[in-house]
Amino acid sequence: MPLHRTRIKLCGLTQPDDVDHAVALGADAIGLVFYPPSPRYVATGRAAELARRAGPFVTVTGLFVNASADDVARVLDQVPLTLLQFHGDETPEQCAEIAGKVGLPWLRALRVQPGTDLVEFADRFAAAQGLLLDAFVEGYGGGGHVFDWTLIPPQWLSQSAPPSAAPRLVLSGGLSAQNVAGAIERVRPYAVDVSSGIEAARGVKDRARMTAFVRAVREADAALGASVQA
């Protein structure tokens, strides 16, 4: 058994078959997008069906962009989310207010670019359950681009550092079956998040790519475990 296990979040699912396949693959989490301009947006009625199909042991994440507490609460009236992901310009106070109102843990996404002070950002959002790092693009949502992983503070990457020295990192941004092993080897994230890397077209998931991505993560974890035990 590998000593390192990278959690897997498959994001932007829109179809029941996508969710069924994600569950069958053993994904730890799925992501549902509640940002209407996104091609991966799902209305609450469809989202409720998708969330129910995930079952009790898969985290159902709701992605919101600058939504109000009332907007999020209205979604929760119909959709059994278990985690919130704030992907806009929300302040720490706004995140805490919204999450407190609906009683759910939350992640804060950051679109990384040169000059971004990740340590300062992590300190501001210390109440989050994790920090999701994505590539910077104009507008909101993922653009399928990989950001420069050397921008991640080196103290967060040290395997000898205590867990309290770094936030739980959820690595996103242009990941695919072709590059996720390298990402895991370099960054050792708590989790990886993928959307465009498992699509045949924008908003259309591809089961073969989903399978290949999960397999690549598992193989990378196994390789890390073998290197630790050697």
UniProtKB/Swiss-Prot annotation:
GO molecular function: phosphoribosylanthranilate isomerase activity
Keyword Cytoplasm among record annotations: no
EC number(s) on file: 5.3.1.24
Disulfide bonds: none
GO biological process terms held by the UniProt record: L-tryptophan biosynthetic process
Pfam families recorded: PRAI
Swiss-Prot/TrEMBL catalytic activity: N-(5-phospho-beta-D-ribosyl)anthranilate = 1-(2-carboxyphenylamino)-1-deoxy-D-ribulose 5-phosphate
Pathway as given in its UniProt record: Amino-acid biosynthesis; L-tryptophan biosynthesis; L-tryptophan from chorismate: step 3/5
Stored CDD domains: PRAI
Keywords, in A-Z order: Amino-acid biosynthesis, Aromatic amino acid biosynthesis, Isomerase, Tryptophan biosynthesis
Enzyme class: isomerase
UniProt-listed PANTHER family: N-(5'-PHOSPHORIBOSYL)ANTHRANILATE ISOMERASE
Family: Belongs to the TrpF family.
Protein name: N-(5'-phosphoribosyl)anthranilate isomerase
UniProt source species: Ralstonia nicotianae (strain ATCC BAA-1114 / GMI1000)
Upper taxonomic lineage: Bacteria, Pseudomonadati, Pseudomonadota, Betaproteobacteria, Burkholderiales
Gene responsible for this protein: trpF
